[in-house]
Amino acid sequence: MTAVRRATVVGAAGFIGRHLCRHLQRQGFEVHEAARDERGWIDGPLGHVFYCAGLTADFAQRPHDTVDAHVSLLDRVLRPQRFHSLVYLSSTRLYDGSLAEAAVEDAPLTLQPGQPRHLFDLSKALGEALCHAAGGGRARVARLSCVVKDASDD
């Protein structure tokens, strides 16, 4: 008998999360689509967590929601350690202020708290740091770039 592979997708209602849920289901995962207003899902076994929650276009108008999505909720997932693995979706926007010619993962980041646009970058960087510091060696970060919709998307 094969063990059930469980996945929890945080941010399942968003563009990436929605497509990831479909992909995981096709791969035979039992997928829990964690909703923003749902309570209690953090208290159970989460399996493989894909952390897709976040704000993009309206982050500047919603600073508290941005920090909550990128950091606070992530902390509530990481703290009890009820996951097998976790992938935190970050962004290559963290490289925007870099003076380097090419973006590489270990390049120093130039983030300026006084710049309103850097709220997004700082909150994503803090989410990454939290994964590295509190992920128990089971959290990974993926910095995505240029996620687009193609003709086959609904």
Model-flagged regions — what are they?
Residues 75-119:
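Conserved Rossmann-fold NAD(P)-dependent oxidoreductase catalytic core, especially the SDR/UDP-sugar
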Residues 114-140:
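Active-site Tyr-X1-5-Lys
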Residues 4-27:
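N-terminal Rossmann NAD(P)H-binding glycine-rich loop of SDR-like oxidoreductase domains
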Residues 38-80, 92-97:
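NAD(P)H-binding glycine-rich loop region in Rossmannoid oxidoreductase-like domains
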Residues 29-38:
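Conserved glycine-rich Rossmann-like NAD(P)H-binding loop of the short-chain dehydrogenase/reductase
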Residues 95, 118, 140-154:
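Flexible, glycine-rich beta-alpha linker
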